[in-house]
């Protein structure tokens, strides 16, 4: 049932770790969890055009460290850092802890599942052909070194009366292999005909070491250099 479970949750503590990294007593846990959700929702709403990939929240002693992974850091920082200071003040008002805000650039957005999904969603909302958007995303990921990618669209595709599912795959996407480094994202596109669900799986290779931090280290190396070229062909498929 590898295709039924979230690939990220399945690999936690195997080769990747959580996006919220802190410990709290039982009486404080619920408040801090709700605070994390509000901070993430606020950042994604406030920085819609910045291409937000991940928001990592760490809470060392009486502090709150927020790290934003973005494809366009200049949009968040603004001219002479004016925008990021405004963002810092707004986030600081949402937490009682001392805030530290960091910005990390995603150098290869074509290999980030969340950014690929957002790109497809924006194209669908601009009435671009869904097949063209899917193929373009797959081709860009393969060109940048992904070993495999799968894109799944579900809904009233092309304004059809009956909703259906279509997907494209290039290379390998081994969902059952725990050592596989698979990035996953689930995005929604709001079109005139209704919501279209977008799922993206990107296979970047295998991680042999059993370490929750291994994926983050490998991801940083992949952003700096090129990845291996994929093997195998694509297989388009449509499910009604």
Swiss-Prot record:
Molecular function as annotated in GO: mRNA binding; rRNA binding; structural constituent of ribosome
A Pfam family assignment: KH_2
GO (cellular component) term, any one: cytosolic small ribosomal subunit
Domain KH type-2: start-end pairs: 39-107
Gene Ontology biological-process entries: translation
Family matches, as SUPFAM superfamilies: Prokaryotic type KH domain (KH-domain type II), Ribosomal protein S3 C-terminal domain
Biased amino acid composition, Gly residues: 224-234
Disulfide bonds: none
Residue ranges with Basic and acidic residues bias: 212-222
Keyword terms, alphabetized: Ribonucleoprotein, Ribosomal protein, RNA-binding, rRNA-binding
Region ranges (Disordered): 212-240
Signal peptide extent: none
Record text on subunit structure and interactions: Part of the 30S ribosomal subunit. Forms a tight complex with proteins S10 and S14.
Function noted in UniProt: Binds the lower part of the 30S subunit head. Binds mRNA in the 70S ribosome, positioning it for translation.
Protein family membership: Belongs to the universal ribosomal protein uS3 family.
Name assigned to this protein: Small ribosomal subunit protein uS3
